[in-house]
Amino acid sequence: MTIRHDSITAELALRLVVPGGAPVPVAATVRYEPADPYAISIGFRTGADEVVEWTFARQLLSDGVRRPAGDGDVQVWPAAQSGGRIVCLSLSSPSGHALFEMPRSEVLAFLRRTYSAVPLGGESDIIDLDAELALLIWGGPER
């Protein structure tokens, strides 16, 4: 199996859902690093030089395109609106909660690119879980 190692990024035009108001456009960059094959990151520009980044499972985003997924700080689910199909992304933290709408076609295009770099099920070919577990338990390689 051939695995690419370059970062995969995409710019997404999200909409922040504002209760009782019009949605607010938010620029975001979604990123996938094949060296960390189970995760994706999404960075929200909050100011000229500030980015708030969230990292969560690639599988969560993939599942959420088709059906509601997640039961913690990150939840993803499909929805429809007059402009077409979207993916909703709910993020919760002690400092607040945000609900974003993402164009489904853009999310699917990004996911396809990640799966061409590291196919579904190929994540364990990149990460040696035994070595990672040994590092957590003993602070070094297996003994």
Swiss-Prot record:
Residues of the signal peptide: none
Job description of the protein: Involved in sporulation-specific cell division. Required for early stages of sporulation. Important in the process of growth cessation prior to sporulation-specific cell division. Recruits cell division protein FtsZ to the future septum sites and tethers the contractile ring structure (Z ring) to the cytoplasmic membrane during sporulation. Stimulates polymerization and filament length of FtsZ in vitro.
BP GO annotations: asexual sporulation resulting in formation of a cellular spore; cell division; cell septum assembly; division septum assembly; hyphal growth; positive regulation of cell division; spore wall assembly
Subunit-level organization: Interacts with SsgA. Interacts with FtsZ (via N-terminus).
Keywords on record: Cell cycle, Cell division, Septation, Sporulation
InterPro entries according to UniProt: SsgB, SsgB_sf
Location in or out of the cell: Cell septum
Name of the protein in question: Sporulation-specific cell division protein SsgB
Pfam families: SsgA (PF04686)
Similarity comment: Belongs to the SsgA family.
Cellular component terms (Gene Ontology): cell septum; divisome complex; spore wall
Source organism superkingdom: Bacteria
Main location: other
